[in-house]
Amino acid sequence: MERPPGLRPGAGGPWEMRERLGTGGFGNVSLYQHRELDLKIAIKSCRLELSSKNRERWCHEIQIMKKLDHANVVKACDVPEELNFLINDVPLLAMEYCSGGDLRKLLNKPENCCGLKESQILSLLSDIGSGIRYLHENKIIHRDLKPENIVLQDVGGKTIHKIIDLGYAKDVDQGSLCTSFVGTLQYLAPELFENKPYTATVDYWSFGTMVFECIAGYRPFLHHLQPFTWHEKIKKKDPKCIFACEEMTGEVRFSSHLPQPNSLCSLIVEPMESWLQLMLNWDPQQRGGPIDLTLKQPRCFALMDHILNLKIVHILNMTSAKIISFLLPCDESLHSLQSRIERETGINTGSQELLSETGISLDPRKPASQCVLDGVRGCDSYMVYLFDKSKTVYEGPFASRSLSDCVNYIVQDSKIQLPIIQLRKVWAEAVHYVSGLKEDYSRLFQGQRAAMLSLLRYNANLTKMKNTLISASQQLKAKLEFFRKSIQLDLERYSEQMTYGISSEKMLKAWKEMEEKAIHYSEVGVIGYLEDQIMSLHTEIMELQKSPYGRRQGDLMESLEQRAIDLYKQLKHRPPDHLYSDSTEMVKIIVHTVQSQDRVLKELFGHLSKLLGCKQKIIDLLPKVEVALSNIKEADNTVMFMQGKRQKEIWHLLKIACTQSSARSLVGSSLEGTVTPPVSAWLPPTLADREHPLTCVVTPQDGETLAQMIEENLNCLGHLSTIIREANEDQSSSLMSLDWSWLAE
């Protein structure tokens, strides 16, 4: 293993150097790992003999680093005891290790040749802007901000950017300032480059240059030229100019706008251009803008915060494959947003269905801010999908994204010879175009997936309702079976006693009507036809889930993207003597990718139409299931009501019978000298020997109650005796003379 100069073998103890992370003007940064604890730290060591002044500044850097504590500034830590020694008469600096590499490594990836994604740009703007603000508040000017001095660390799945190498060791005597920044002059503020006095605004220039490069893929001002050359051409630029390029004629073209292509959505471009105009102002006194008296900070920070606080909803219109973006006021309702969507797309608000990536429909009762996630920025990070509910067939595919002028130029004539330097720019845009086609498909596939998840939610709801329906149907069937058997038994028993006991035509008619209703309600519980339709839909959904078109089909496009990247890499590494080349191979890849996208989009929209058609069937079927369930519940309630009503009637009959039986017993016991014919004497001769059906009713035996009843009715005994005698004389008298009007209740 490689060791820092002066480190004796074994002197590091359990700490082992794993790799060299970087080399600066005066020092090396190496990764050390603890063999047992799996701890990792970055150690910065001096690799040169320093003058006393520079040695003092090195030590000063270490002291300052240990005082800093901010999430976006790399933290210093204690040097392990085993490594705590002097190298070249200066101490080591231990820092937290960031495993994501530096920003330069990210920018050098061929897929980022035309800039980073919007989410990455905004994340960098937030992190490094916060870090610079912290340093400036602590009276620290970095002076050497560049992609190599921005490291990335993954924290809970989120990339955090941190500033490293505060540059104190590079603050050498003013006479050799430029030479101390060898290799980093492209990001230096003009006043540093020209060896003039400077303020904190030098960091604004460097930061603006970095952000521009992250947006476009290259630096803002004549990026292919050395600073000594482009400074003379740029220093008289307009304050609003943020971009300069050299035309084929050699003329320099200035612009106050960001170049295309880039990944920023249209709503961010304008405020970002305004921010860059503040950061890239040549005049250090004007750079960053005036101090905001309310916020007590330069306008550039206020504008940066404004950009980062913008709530923008990105909506993919699945009917046109176009992305539309809206800036959301904090209190906007979803209905208001849908009205804006209607004006933009022509899709009526009532026909709009907005789905999240998980297939959940947006809640119309909640504000429009539900379309954006807290802390998530960029159209590449989160999308809402718009569907037209009035359509179930999405024709697709749609026209591919437009070619840039450069790419269109080589597509029209792939054999034209272009200078390698110019070709690099053209091929970079070609790679960006091919990657864009793949990303367009990926977004549409995600929209199809949201539609599938929505379908599965509808299907789950249908399944739940089906189970409820089947359960209710089975319960109704069981209750009807019980009701029919019980009413049949009641009718049979009623028929047996009506000739000598209690009878009522109204009650009999009511009971028979109940029996007929029960027969009718048995038809309500028949749901087989609905079960068949539901099972058919379940089968259809299962087939859609199994379909290969329900899975990602972009393998060929990814392969073509990689081929385009490989071609671009080869072009970048061509030796200088290869001055010209054609674009035949790159154009083949472009054409093949367009054809591949056309094919997979046809398959995607065909499958999507089936999903939406199936979902519409569920939507049409759900009301039928609800009606059937409502009818079953209504029938169930009616059956239970009829059963209860009949039971009340039976108990009312029993009450009457008990009352009559009690009355007879009381009269018989109080008229000891009176000849009272037995009950059998009241009945017709043919029935006199038969047992009365109500003789099983027990006469009340409570002594106190009977005594009270007798006392209360003494005055009525004479009248009752008369009635009984008349009954004995008139054998034809019966209980039919009683009032049965209660049956009509």
From Swiss-Prot:
Residue(s) carrying Phosphothreonine: 23
Claim: Ubl conjugation is one of the keywords in the record: yes
Record-listed Phosphoserine modification sites: 176, 180
Pfam families listed in its UniProt record: IKBKB_SDD, IKKbetaNEMObind, Pkinase
Keyword vocabulary terms for this entry: ATP-binding, Cytoplasm, Kinase, Nucleotide-binding, Nucleus, Phosphoprotein, Serine/threonine-protein kinase, Transferase, Ubl conjugation
Post-translational modifications: Ubiquitinated by TRIM56 via 'Lys-63'-linked ubiquitination, promoting activation of CHUK/IKKA. Phosphorylated by MAP3K14/NIK, AKT and to a lesser extent by MEKK1, and dephosphorylated by PP2A. Autophosphorylated.
Active site annotation, chain numbering: 144 (proton acceptor)
Source superkingdom: Eukaryota
Disruption of the gene: reported phenotype: Mice show abnormal appearance and die within 4 hours after birth. The epidermal cells are highly proliferative with dysregulated epidermal differentiation.
Regulation: Activated when phosphorylated and inactivated when dephosphorylated.
Region (Leucine-zipper): 455-476
EC number: 2.7.11.10
GO molecular function: ATP binding; IkappaB kinase activity; protein heterodimerization activity; protein homodimerization activity; protein kinase activity; protein serine/threonine kinase activity; scaffold protein binding
Principal localisation: cytoplasm
Tissues and organs where the protein is expressed, per its UniProt entry: Ubiquitous only for isoform 1, isoforms 2 and 3 are expressed predominantly in brain and T-lymphocytes.
UniProt binding sites for ATP: 21-29, 44
A single GO BP: positive regulation of interferon-alpha production
Reaction(s) the record says it catalyses: L-seryl-[I-kappa-B protein] + ATP = O-phospho-L-seryl-[I-kappa-B protein] + ADP + H(+)
Subcellular location(s) of the protein: Cytoplasm; Nucleus
Record bears the keyword Nucleus: yes
Domain notes: The kinase domain is located in the N-terminal region. The leucine zipper is important to allow homo- and hetero-dimerization. At the C-terminal region is located the region responsible for the interaction with NEMO/IKBKG.
Role summary: Serine kinase that plays an essential role in the NF-kappa-B signaling pathway which is activated by multiple stimuli such as inflammatory cytokines, bacterial or viral products, DNA damages or other cellular stresses. Acts as a part of the canonical IKK complex in the conventional pathway of NF-kappa-B activation and phosphorylates inhibitors of NF-kappa-B on serine residues. These modifications allow polyubiquitination of the inhibitors and subsequent degradation by the proteasome.
Family the entry assigns: Belongs to the protein kinase superfamily. Ser/Thr protein kinase family. I-kappa-B kinase subfamily.
Subunit note: Component of the I-kappa-B-kinase (IKK) core complex consisting of CHUK, IKBKB and IKBKG; probably four alpha/CHUK-beta/IKBKB dimers are associated with four gamma/IKBKG subunits. The IKK core complex seems to associate with regulatory or adapter proteins to form a IKK-signalosome holo-complex. The IKK complex associates with TERF2IP/RAP1, leading to promote IKK-mediated phosphorylation of RELA/p65. Part of a complex composed of NCOA2, NCOA3, CHUK/IKKA, IKBKB, IKBKG and CREBBP. Part of a 70-90 kDa complex at least consisting of CHUK/IKKA, IKBKB, NFKBIA, RELA, ELP1 and MAP3K14.
Name of the protein described by the UniProt record: Inhibitor of nuclear factor kappa-B kinase subunit alpha
Organism: Mus musculus
